[in-house]
């Protein structure tokens, strides 16, 4: 017996567009000498004392296992010949605006997820084109013809599947998932590929012996709800290709944060500071990637006994700089103290964004 009704609207036409290695692609476009070389957007560890994280990198760098949020030091160790570029985020914002202008030629139902990806509902569109695949091809053509950049696109009847589809053929790919194919495609995927299923949920699913979409299909609804609460029903629906989440035109990101849970409690100050610095770097990279600056820094600490404290401080100016965020977080952890209790979780968030 189903606890919640399974309602699936198959009439919608949703496109997910994801720019390919966006920041790095812009740099290669503007400096042709970089073509074919591994390019990393992030601080050069040879100039920053080994500090910094990778904001993004091109596909040549990804061939070495480099990815976003990796430390610049590790990226250099994997690929010493890589070219590090600190990044011009104002330029990236302007190109992102140009990409969004292209989207709006076809529909005003656009939900930006970040500077380089968005969902489009083209069920009803400005050009009266009945084929979502044709619209996706036109968008890819416009982006290449006008901006000399490539984008991957996924087309399906909901956002979840459109996102899955856009990840299936990169770069410059276009994948369509039809209703009759959805369950079979999802069944073949590892649960890590399910958008919205985080690392902790994946670990818990693995503990249940659930590794693929097919494994998830075989788990009764009540078992998932007992284990994951309301999110268990979402998992039950995802495995069946069901999602009715609308494209939210007014979506506004209000904060940017990262947190990490530790299986072994942290007791030493140097270990805590090392983790906090890493979190600050990742938050700053996320802010820059999304073109955001904030002025309120929030530190979250959860102890071994599961008690949780948060501390915040507001700056006079808006920032997206690692050094500024780190300075405030160091002050906040000093104010909180009590490291000797053992720390189970640390989190850093920047909010109160510049409008």
Curated annotation (Swiss-Prot):
Note on how the cofactor is bound: Binds 2 magnesium ions per subunit.
Reaction(s) catalysed (UniProt annotation): DNA(n) + a 2'-deoxyribonucleoside 5'-triphosphate = DNA(n+1) + diphosphate
Location(s) in or outside the cell: Cytoplasm
Cofactor(s) needed for function: Mg(2+)
Gene Ontology CC annotations of this record: cytosol
Alphabetized Gene3D superfamilies for the sequence: 3.30.70.270, 3.40.1170.60, 5' to 3' exonuclease, C-terminal subdomain (1.10.150.20), DNA polymerase, Y-family, little finger domain (3.30.1490.100)
Swiss-Prot/TrEMBL keywords: Cytoplasm, DNA damage, DNA repair, DNA replication, DNA-binding, DNA-directed DNA polymerase, Magnesium, Metal-binding, Mutator protein, Nucleotidyltransferase, Transferase
Positions of the record's site feature: Substrate discrimination: 23
Binding site for Mg(2+): 18, 116
Function: Poorly processive, error-prone DNA polymerase involved in untargeted mutagenesis. Copies undamaged DNA at stalled replication forks, which arise in vivo from mismatched or misaligned primer ends. These misaligned primers can be extended by PolIV. Exhibits no 3'-5' exonuclease (proofreading) activity. May be involved in translesional synthesis, in conjunction with the beta clamp from PolIII.
Protein name, per record: DNA polymerase IV
Species of the source: Streptococcus suis (strain 98HAH33)
Gene expressing this chain: dinB
């Amino acid at each position: 017996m189903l606890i919640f009704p399974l309602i699936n609207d198959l009439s919608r036409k949703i496109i997910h567009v994801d720019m390919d290695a966006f920041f790095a692609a812009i740099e290669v476009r503007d400096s042709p000498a970089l073509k074919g070389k591994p390019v990393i957007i992030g601080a050069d560890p040879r100039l920053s004392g080994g500090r910094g994280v990778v904001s993004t990198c091109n596909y040549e760098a990804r061939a070495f296992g480099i990815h976003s949020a990796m430390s610049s030091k590790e990226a250099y160790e994997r690929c010493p010949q890589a070219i590090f570029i600190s990044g011009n985020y104002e330029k990236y914002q302007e190109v992102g605006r140009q990409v969004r202008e292209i989207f709006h030629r076809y529909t005003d139902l656009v939900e930006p997820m970040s500077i380089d990806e968005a969902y489009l509902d083209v069920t009803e569109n400005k050009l009266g084109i009945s084929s979502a695949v044709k619209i996706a091809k036109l968008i890819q053509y416009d982006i290449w013809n006008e901006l000399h950049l490539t984008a991957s696109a996924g087309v399906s009847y909901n956002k979840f599947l459109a996102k899955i589809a856009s990840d299936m053929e990169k770069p410059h790919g276009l994948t369509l998932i039809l209703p009759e194919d959805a369950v079979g495609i999802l069944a073949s995927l590892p649960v890590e590929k399910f958008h919205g299923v985080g690392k902790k949920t994946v670990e818990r699913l693995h503990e249940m012996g659930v590794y693929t979409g097919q494994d998830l299909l075989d788990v009764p609804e009540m078992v998932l709800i007992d284990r994951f609460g309301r999110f268990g029903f979402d998992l039950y629906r995802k495995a069946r290709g069901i999602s009715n989440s609308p494209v939210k035109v007014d979506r506004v990101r209000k904060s940017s944060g990262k947190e990490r849970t530790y299986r072994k409690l942290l007791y030493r100050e140097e270990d805590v500071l090392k983790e906090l610095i890493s979190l600050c770097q990742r938050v700053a990279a996320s802010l820059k990637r999304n073109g955001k600056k904030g002025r309120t820094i929030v530190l979250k600490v959860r102890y071994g006994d599961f008690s949780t404290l948060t501390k915040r401080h507001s700056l006079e100016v808006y920032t997206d700089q690692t050094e500024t965020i780190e300075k405030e977080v160091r002050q906040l952890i000093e104010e909180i103290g009590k490291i000797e209790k053992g720390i189970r979780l640390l989190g850093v968030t920047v909010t109160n964004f510049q409008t």
